[in-house]
């Protein structure tokens, strides 16, 4: 047993969650197992213990394996900064920023790093479960591919293809994928499974048999929709649980165009007393919101302009006048100040953009990136709690409101607060995962916390996910494919 790979017949078919569930199922069989994704595109990154960064989906998969996340689990991370360009992170460290067209010429040079990371994991674990990206059916991207069949063939890893029946056309998804693949690529596929079924699974029996007959591939089952998916950290901001439709205190988060590292929202959204509202472009900020969160952004100045285009700057000013609370995290913190300057053009064209002016601070973008886990003493609401979090940002922020810090990090003030304490900015991520801090923060908003352990809830959801896979799929057969 060495490795197997999960690929999708399309994007968003549920590969990440399937890999997490298979990792937990394999671990419960007594295997040492590690996740691996050759290439991920996401602005939702996790910081590793050695100061690198990987996709947050791989960090969740590592948790399913009982492991600390390491950079080898996701050697290539692409972090979009615009519609046509992205930052390229290789084995946890920023390599360059490139346009999509230019990345095609860079990809073949990255296969060495991908195989190096994969082989390190393979040498130290019984099983490596690999997740593809997008779909191998995008054959126009096959040249130089390192994410799907290019990797599978280079590493000789068998593939299970996943179709998403929820969006319709699953027969065409899977049979069509075989039809467009190069025969040598198609030979890497050992079987298929159907994901996200709703209703009576037996109603798809004929379709399931038809796929097997048309492709000659073995079927590993049809998986119903996992009802506890909302209890796992969201990979996409659109997947964040919105809480009950009625009841609960509203916390609103602005869905920025380059939203990044929004894992801070999951523990808040899981609180029964909170109704998390993701404010979409074109929508006003709910007047009943007790707290408005400005999340992280991969393009602070760009998202400041985007925010103003939605009229959210006007809504925020009105929210503050009504006595509402505002929390800016990372890029959101930078937006709250008087200005954001990027003299070297690190995130885009050089220049300075006026901020929202809700905090008396100013930010200057610098080339150095702070990427570290930290242990802090939270000063907000006088909690004085010791909490673990992480920082992942460029830029330095200074100003008078930093005299009222959100926390103390390594003996230094971190973050800033307005004189009335209602507007807060901080570079710290991950604090809301700490139950005591989350309770203290919510108490300051007049919200009673549930007292539930967020970490225990995620662990329970991973166990339930593994149980769900064991019930409906031939997990033993899937794991037996590994070679």
From Swiss-Prot:
Belongs to the CobB/CobQ family. CobQ subfamily. Pathway: Cofactor biosynthesis; adenosylcobalamin biosynthesis. This is Cobyric acid synthase. GO terms for biological process: cobalamin biosynthetic process. Gene3D superfamilies: 3.40.50.880, P-loop containing nucleotide triphosphate hydrolases (3.40.50.300). The active site is at residues 330, 429. Catalyzes amidations at positions B, D, E, and G on adenosylcobyrinic A,C-diamide. NH(2) groups are provided by glutamine, and one molecule of ATP is hydrogenolyzed for each amidation. The gene is cobQ. Pfam families: CbiA, GATase_3. Keywords: Cobalamin biosynthesis, Glutamine amidotransferase. SUPFAM superfamilies: Class I glutamine amidotransferase-like, P-loop containing nucleoside triphosphate hydrolases. It comes from Rhodobacter capsulatus (Rhodopseudomonas capsulata). It comes from the Bacteria. Residues 248-437 form the GATase cobBQ-type domain. The lineage of its organism: Bacteria, Pseudomonadati, Pseudomonadota, Alphaproteobacteria, Rhodobacterales. GO terms for molecular function: ABC-type vitamin B12 transporter activity; catalytic activity.
